[in-house]
Amino acid sequence: YGTWTQFSNLRRIIMTTETKKPGRIADYNKTLPILELYTCIQSEGSRQGRPTVAVRTTGCTHRCWFGEGGWCDSWYTSIHPGKGTYTFNDIVKIYDENPTITEMMLTGGSPTMQPDLCNELTHFANQRGIFITIETEGSHFIETDYPFGLISLSPKFSNSVPKIDVTTPMGKLVDQKMIDKHNSLRLNHQAIEQTLAYHSDYHYKPVYDGTEETMNEIEEFRVRHNIPKNKTWLMPAGDNREELIKQYPISLEKAFEMGYNWTGRDHIVAWDTKRAV
């Protein structure tokens, strides 16, 4: 019964919106919009603690600022996006050099802005027996040829909207244009419905800043999309060790109160603002 219901819901959702199938990457030596490529331990969410290869794309639809929690911890892919430096062959090579790793964390930025890369990675993962987790805010639905193993969904609530005249990490002042860009696809509910229905599994990983306003938005979103509490992982805001640790007890208590799971951000606790860890 559950399988048939899932199929019916998927068919209904996909039929309501035309979706363009992503392409493939023919040239494995071409430089792609990948800013970082490294081995690490997954430090957030339901697959925490597993050795993985992180593939970080550059470019993002959002400009997240969490007040005292700081800017997005990967601001160098979004607010001030760097240029990609890696090829698909570099991904092949890192798995060849680390044959015991069978996980991939596709992150950003916003990796769903790169549909052909996402699709090619699902082919590679299917051939190699690799489990892909894609971290996404849900702005774009991609009907990849093979579903992702896990959608790690972190939608952007009102606590992520930057404020006028706040200074970005590289000294730019926030203006209305930046705010409008951030809000344009901040909660694309239709794309989120399609994504959760199509791909293999998901967890919901909202960023919590300690306010009741944010918690209300987190819970409203969970109810709207029929997300079970056991698939919800509350994560504290913070782009550095000091701010993050301040939020740990607040978010732990709230997760317990709400009946959610809780996740830390171990890479920030261990290495603070160091990149590629």
Question: What are the residue ranges of the model-derived segments?
Answer:
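Conserved AdoMet/S-adenosylmethionine-binding subsite of the radical SAM
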Residues: 92, 96, 101-103, 112-277
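Conserved Radical SAM active-site core
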Residues: 16-42, 51-52, 58, 62, ...
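Short, Lys/Arg-enriched N-terminal segments with co-localized hydrophobic residues
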Residues: 1-14
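General helical secondary-structure elements
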Residues: 7-8, 52, 124, 261
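A short catalytic or substrate-binding loop motif that flags glycine-/basic-rich loops and adjacent residues
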Residues: 46-48
